[in-house]
Amino acid sequence: TRQRAKTELGSRTVDQVIAALVKWTKALNRADPNFEHQRLEALWLHQVMNVANEPLLNEILASTEPRARAAAVRVHCYWRDRVNQPLDTLAKLVKDPHPRVRLEAIRSLSFFNTSKAADIALESVELPQDQYLKYALDETMRTLERFK
């Protein structure tokens, strides 16, 4: 069960967990219908262990599964100070074809202390917006207005 897994992982060192996790992740079968979810679980465990794995993050950000991409954008936000060119990545993600991915990217931009983040967020209006995207954009712009 999940609780037993959490207990077991908690009894191990970070190095032990990450070594086993990397091995497990490499052995995942791309043909498995749960492949994207399993990679997300690996990404989330890296996050719990406070070990950024930018290559895995970037792979999931490029996934064909929009829910996986959206979840990875949330992790990207938490790791924004630990990944390369986070604003460049978010500039691509605010134009993602899936609205949930765009919403997460817009929300993520609110955590940056720069006017460039506001400029990137505004690029999202080039694609259709629902009430949730509009709300996220309004809140992000309100947060970033002090950096203009």
Give residue spans per PLM region.
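Alpha-helix N-cap/helix-start positions at coil->helix boundaries
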Residues: 33-36, 66-67, 84, 97-100, ...
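Alpha-helical segment of the N-proximal tetratricopeptide repeat
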Residues: 1-14
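Extended, hydrophobic alpha-helical segments in both membrane/secreted and soluble proteins
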Residues: 68-79, 86, 90, 99-108, ...
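Boundary/linker segments of alpha-helical solenoid repeat arrays
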Residues: 129-137
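Alpha-solenoid HEAT/ARM repeat scaffold
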Residues: 2-3, 37-40, 70-71, 88, ...
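Hydrophobic core positions within HEAT/HEAT-like alpha-solenoid repeats
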Residues: 6, 22, 40-43, 58, ...
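Amphipathic alpha-helical scaffolding segments comprising HEAT/armadillo-like alpha-solenoid repeats
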Residues: 14-29, 50-62, 81-94, 114-125, ...
